């Protein structure tokens, strides 16, 4: 156990002396030195980018690294994760989401979690069943073969709901 290991105790004490236990993230954990307990997110988004926001569909159910923010879908839309992910891939969604970003040197765009939370989102409940089927079919093709023509087709469908 942790009490039996003097080197671990000394290491934890160094953290206390340095004030690590008072910093925001560690102070929210019990005990403060434990690993962050994070739920598995179905979609990840890169925290920084230069040429388009990177979205990852977490099909493996892995926990994300710190280079990604987690996107959790409200329970009412749990069956629509692939539709939502498809929307995020489109140029129109990228344009809308980029309105809430900070730009750093050399064109690096940085996103904080609240930047993403504040971004406008298409109300996907207005999408017809016919378009949902098209979107899912395109999504399934993208999973197998990432072609820009498929993204153009997705963009056209979603753009029709934003006009």
Explain the meaning of each model-derived region.
Residues 1-141, 151:
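Polybasic, glycine- and aromatic-enriched phosphate-binding surface used to engage nucleic acids
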Residues 144:
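Nucleic-acid-interacting cores, centered on viral/eukaryotic replication and modification enzymes
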Residues 149-163:
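Short amphipathic coiled-coil heptad-repeat segments
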């Amino acid at each position: 156990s942790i009490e039996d290991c003097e080197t671990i105790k000394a290491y934890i004490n160094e953290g206390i002396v340095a004030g690590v236990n008072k910093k925001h993230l560690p102070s929210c954990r019990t005990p403060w030195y434990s690993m962050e307990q994070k739920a598995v997110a179905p979609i990840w988004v890169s925290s920084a980018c230069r040429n388009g926001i990177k979205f990852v569909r977490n099909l493996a159910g892995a926990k994300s690294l710190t280079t990604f923010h987690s996107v959790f879908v409200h329970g009412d839309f749990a069956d629509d994760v692939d539709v939502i992910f498809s929307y995020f891939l489109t140029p129109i969604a990228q344009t809308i989401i980029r309105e809430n970003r900070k730009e750093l040197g050399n064109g690096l765009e940085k996103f904080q979690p609240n930047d993403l939370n504040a971004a406008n989102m298409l109300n996907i409940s207005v999408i017809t069943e016919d378009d949902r089927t098209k979107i899912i079919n395109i999504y399934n093709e993208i999973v197998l073969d990432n072609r820009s023509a498929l993204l153009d087709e997705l963009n056209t469908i979603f753009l029709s709901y934003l006009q």
